[in-house]
Amino acid sequence: MMLSRRRVPSSKRALLLFVLALSSACSTIETKRRDWSKYTGPGAQYFHAEEIPFPQVDDPLEPTNRALAGMDLALARYVIRPVAAVYRFVVPQDVREHLTKTADNLLYPGRVLNNLLQAKWSAAGEETARFCVNTTVGALGFFDPATDMGLHPRPEDFGQTFAKWGWKRSTYLFVPILGPSSIRDALGAIPDTYAEPATYYLPAALGRRFHLASNGVEAALRQVEVNYDAYEPARTLFTLNREVDVEDFSWARDESGVTQSLDAIFLEPEDRDFGARAHTDTVWIEATGRELSFSYWLQAEPAPLVFLVPGLGGHRLGASTLALAEIAFLNGSSVVAVSNPTNWEFIENGASLSLPGYVPSDAHDVHVALTRVNRRLVSLYPGRFTSKRLTGISLGALHTLFIAGNERLAETEGLVPFDVYVALDPAVSLEHGLLALDRFYNAPLAFAPQERARKIDEIFGKVLYLSQGELDPGMELPFTKLEAEFLIGLAYRLDLQFLILASQARHDLGVLRTRRTLLTQAPAFREVSEYSYMEYMHAFVLPYLSTRVPGITCDEAGARRTFERCDLRAVEGGLRANPRVLVFANENDFLLRAEDITWLRDVLGARAHFFPAGGHLGNLHRKTIHAVIDAVVESTDERAPDHARNGSVDPDAPTQPP
């Protein structure tokens, strides 16, 4: 977790010496792998296909780094967070955002100096122009008109200068409070600090550090809660940011459903403190014998209650979940969210099967959990909910439709009925969706082998360049179709790693060979990074289901039957008969084939709504889309029968799917 990247010399020296003294605590665990080269069982073609290697980072000090990251987490959670809450309450969000811009403007001397030392003349000129514009027109940096003029930040520091001069790779280092670093960057932080004007006025230096820590602590802690292991992606992203140095790349964009899908990054809450205002509670899940957490936002007066289920790997406090919760809350509804069955939290605490991926079971587990949540909220706040609406996004939308399709059977089990079922950008075929994600991840195979590494670095370079500035909804993201495919596939491949490790921590099938300890995880991540989604389904899920689900055998026929049962066509009858099912999707969503769209229109008729563009989730941040969805949902809710609105809940409902 990184709360601030600027350093104070004395504390940096002390912490650096401390960490170097602990450097003997190195990891000795090796990555081991199962040999699939001679495998001829179901799905063998996926195990023998060429794959792009997942970005890996050497971390010889991992045990020490993880221990220090744990100290940092405790400090942030129990010291910084309470103080920061007071600061954020007193200082409005708009003011804090402008203070951040002012603090950033003060970094100009170090930035321009390091651009010059690296012979980046154009970048130094652009940084100087930014500083002049923002200092004058922008009122000492309180505003950022330079970005609107096309002058983007060019942040460089002495660590990057040392890299440019030849010190390319350096041992990763985590320093409490100061965050991810390396030996090279730690040394570079000393001249960095002296190049920062605030250093020479202690109140300014302390104020800047306090502001940045207070402003970022909730987001940082949320990353720890949302991810199965926040340390791993933070280390990889930091190292890529420090090592990828691409000055020239093609600023090109293809207009396609895939590139439009990248606009899903804009699906985040407008109020950055919205997540911090969530109430969190737990319900008991019989299948696991554990408590499952849920988050909710309650209206002061009686209102509809919206149940949210996020997409693949999604957590109840993830950015897209919070965005949808905020939209529903601002529209007058109370909102409750649970994590997706493919997220570590649900795998550990809410799943009847240890391995997610079998949609009928996953959807049933969600329904059981929501039934428990509904009963809990109704008991705490009687008379506060005028109706109940289930909304799912992406894979959560597929689960929502399975719940809707099995509504009559669920009622016999005492599971909560809903007045409206809203599916946002669902897949119809799980198999098609997983194949698409695997294909996207391997999109760079289209590059010639000798230039593949450079091309991938260029893609990372674009991402890192854009991350330095303001990203506003509506701006064009400069990625080609192939580049967008790779970025989407890469993001979901990391979710797969979390999924595999979380499921194997609960029930080890013996597929993985690498030992894991509390402070050494990197070797295991290297092993699981070599599995695709289709390999996961055939190496983990299929053998597991064959011993637990009637009709599933561990062969090609069993694999085919599994995917058929995970297809929406398996619940076609229930969907046709349920007038309260709504689907909102885009015609150019990569998860939907032409025959899938035709099938949805045939089954749902006017209840299936398709927008002409937006890709997968790429237009859900747009208020015009919100208005269309809200109008249709309200109209459907008004026509809901009383049995759904006032349905009773059996607290002893079974927790296993039929």
Tell me what each language-model feature is.
Residues 26-121, 207-252, 643-658:
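N-terminal targeting leaders of membrane proteins
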Residues 297-344:
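Short, surface-exposed "cap/lid" segments of acyl-processing enzymes
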Residues 405-527:
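Alpha/beta-hydrolase-fold enzymes
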Residues 253-301:
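N-terminal cap/lid segment of alpha/beta-hydrolase-fold proteins
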Residues 590-596:
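Conserved alpha/beta-hydrolase "acid-adjacent" motif
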Residues 583-585:
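Short beta-strand/loop motif that positions the catalytic acidic residue
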Residues 355-380:
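Alpha/beta-hydrolase active-site loop
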Residues 614-625:
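Catalytic histidine-centered segment of alpha/beta-hydrolase-like enzymes
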